[in-house]
């Protein structure tokens, strides 16, 4: 069994920022991440050795530092060398265990007992869940820890996202930002990642309607749209799709975190976001 004073579930931006702030304040913690990577929805995909951001394309409400470069999006920033580079920088000197999907949480006299699907056991005094709220709530529900159904946290929902990643023969000047049939093209112009890269965020309506369809069916619909664009119909070299079931919280909880039970907390983008949740949690951890 692995014992720590503080355990954070989720190595997305909230979990990493919180762990970094805890370390800076002299407190040690352990992050448990279910996947093989870091950053959650702060994600970069490589196509032909070139990178394209397919998660959170821009960051707001974040402090300037050497890894941030101003972009034309209002109050937005992108990360040089890819959004995932931010996660890598934040994770330096942090204790993180990957591929540890927790499925059991039990209150014990010493705090909280966690069991991963691979049967690894963890114990902590304080536990923070930073996964997208629907995933965190499902874990709590499975362990009879979820708030009553009348609690306002149940009213928070997420929108889905379907994203097309493509490389073009060339990026024309007219294509710096192109709105076309309610779909917005976020173009990686003058990026360190891929000078001719295109990231197309399909509308929320399209994403909701087609999310459960196969990639082939979705691409067929997307190509119908692109073929009507004078800028794109003959320029795409390679492309692939990415999906986010929990892309963005459509509303937020009116507090930076929620204490579900003594020493058991929810935090993240459905609350006040990475920095605000972390700052608010520090005094109670």
Locate the predicted segments by residue.
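Glycine-rich active-site loop/strand segments that organize a redox cofactor
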Residues: 34-78
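Short beta-strand to alpha-helix junction loop
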Residues: 58-65, 73-91, 212-218
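Beta1/beta-strand and adjacent pyrophosphate-binding region of the FAD-binding site
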Residues: 1-14
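A conserved short coil-to-beta-strand element within the FAD-binding core of flavoproteins
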Residues: 98-113
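Glycine-rich FAD pyrophosphate-binding loop
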Residues: 7-9, 20-47
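Core beta-strand elements of the Rossmann-like FAD/NAD(P) dinucleotide-binding domain
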Residues: 2-4, 117-126
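Central helical "cap/lid" subdomain
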Residues: 39, 121-176, 232-234
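Conserved flavin/dinucleotide-binding core of flavoenzymes
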Residues: 17, 37, 54, 195-285
């Amino acid at each position: 069994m692995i014992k720590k004073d503080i355990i954070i579930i989720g190595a997305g931006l909230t979990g990493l920022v919180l762990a970094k702030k805890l370390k800076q304040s002299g407190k040690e913690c352990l992050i448990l991440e279910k996947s093989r990577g870091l950053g959650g929805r702060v994600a970069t995909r490589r196509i032909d050795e070139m990178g394209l951001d397919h998660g959170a394309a821009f960051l707001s409400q974040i402090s300037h530092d050497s890894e941030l470069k101003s972009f034309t999006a209002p109050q937005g920033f992108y990360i040089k060398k890819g959004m995932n580079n931010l996660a890598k920088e934040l994770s330096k000197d942090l204790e993180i265990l990957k591929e540890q999907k927790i499925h059991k949480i039990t209150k014990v006299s010493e705090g909280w007992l966690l069991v991963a699907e691979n049967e690894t056991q963890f114990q902590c005094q304080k536990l923070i869940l930073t996964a997208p709220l629907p995933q965190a709530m499902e874990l709590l529900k499975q362990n009879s820890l979820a708030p009553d159904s009348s609690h306002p946290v149940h009213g928070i929902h997420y929108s889905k996202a379907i994203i097309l990643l493509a490389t073009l023969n060339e990026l024309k000047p007219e294509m710096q930002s192109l709105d076309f049939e309610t779909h917005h093209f976020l173009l990686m112009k003058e990026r360190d990642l891929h000078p001719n890269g295109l990231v197309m965020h399909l509308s929320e309506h399209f994403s909701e309607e087609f999310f459960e369809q196969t990639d082939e069916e979705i691409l067929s619909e997307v190509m119908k749209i692109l073929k009507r664009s004078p800028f794109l119909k003959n320029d795409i070299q390679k492309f692939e799709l990415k999906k986010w079931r929990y892309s963005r919280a459509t509303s937020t909880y009116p507090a930076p975190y929620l204490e579900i039970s003594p020493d058991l907390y929810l935090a993240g983008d459905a609350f006040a976001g990475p920095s605000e949740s972390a700052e608010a949690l520090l005094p109670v951890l």
